[in-house]
From Swiss-Prot:
Principal localisation: cytoplasm
Role this protein plays: Component of the eukaryotic translation initiation factor 3 (eIF-3) complex, which is involved in protein synthesis of a specialized repertoire of mRNAs and, together with other initiation factors, stimulates binding of mRNA and methionyl-tRNAi to the 40S ribosome. The eIF-3 complex specifically targets and initiates translation of a subset of mRNAs involved in cell proliferation.
Organism classification: Eukaryota, Metazoa, Ecdysozoa, Arthropoda, Hexapoda
Entry's Gene Ontology cellular component terms: eukaryotic 43S preinitiation complex; eukaryotic 48S preinitiation complex; eukaryotic translation initiation factor 3 complex; eukaryotic translation initiation factor 3 complex, eIF3m
Compartment annotation: Cytoplasm
The protein's name: Eukaryotic translation initiation factor 3 subunit I
Molecular function, one GO term: translation initiation factor activity
Record text on subunit structure and interactions: Component of the eukaryotic translation initiation factor 3 (eIF-3) complex. The eIF-3 complex interacts with pix.
Similarity field: Belongs to the eIF-3 subunit I family.
InterPro entries assigned to the protein according to its UniProt record, in alphabetical order: eIF3i (IPR027525), WD40/YVTN_repeat-like_dom_sf (IPR015943), WD40_repeat_CS (IPR019775), WD40_repeat_dom_sf (IPR036322), WD40_rpt (IPR001680)
Domain of life: Eukaryota
Annotated organism of origin: Drosophila melanogaster
WD repeat positions: 8-47, 50-89, 145-184, 188-227, 285-326
Amino acid sequence: MRPLMLQGHERSITQIKYNREGDLLFSCSKDQKPNVWYSLNGERLGTYDGHQGAVWCLDVDWESRKLITGAGDMTAKIWDVEYGTVIASIPTKSSVRTSNFSFSGNQAAYSTDKAMGQSCELFLIDVRNADSSLSEQEPTLRIPMTESKITSMLWGPLDETIITGHDNGNIAIWDIRKGQKVVDSGTDHSAGINDMQLSKDGTMFVTASKDTTAKLFDSESLMCLKTYKTERPVNSAAISPIMDHVVLGGGQDAMEVTTTSTKAGKFDSRFFHLIYEEEFARLKGHFGPINSLAFHPDGKSYASGGEDGFVRVQTFDSTYFENIFE
């Protein structure tokens, strides 16, 4: 099970994401330049050059035509995936922390940080006819976050709702037609949420939190279904599209890391059974915390992006699929 090591970033990885078919893997980091890789052999296909600050988030649309990125230079940019050109650059008043295309690809949502006297806000834009004029247009929806800033975000079914994860551990569902909150999870997590990822059918999602747990939620009622416990903050978690498995990645906060030993087990990818909540495997590799995880859409491999600036793509052995959990 030899991993592909993708080395194209000079600083730590902030997010990685596969497109729908899984042939492309997108990565962004604090070095200002998102990359796109051919996931089969790890070849770098291109770089999206244009941001002036750390890129915090990215998402690719259903057809792999458009890419949206959000960065610390106070812009969200929409790119042409194939040509690497900027279609639109949208100025904001603080760093863009999350960005996602809707399933239809007609809309995109992004959220800004609570910083420099600005409150955290959630924005919706229409990207059907995205061009340079998008920077002057008003967003179709703008929701100020009065309590805690958004740290991760997902689109709900039929593009009618947005699920937000917050810095205080709250999760909320927003109706985008009414522009108001419809469901609040309360305090299932006791610390900030670092990442949220949907299951393949969208009926549930997994959260990764600083409170050292990952949890499985129903995406309509926000009922907590399962809890996966670790000893360290969880930075990212993903659900396998074909097996009842969840992978967790994390480690200490970046500023608390003093050792770079891979033997300590701090920086492993940890596999849990989705239903039984039991850990059954660990994979070593990164010299530092794992910041982002993603399963390949076919479920036969997964990728991890770390604080060490590497993206590792691991293909599973046949024993992984034959292993019956008892």
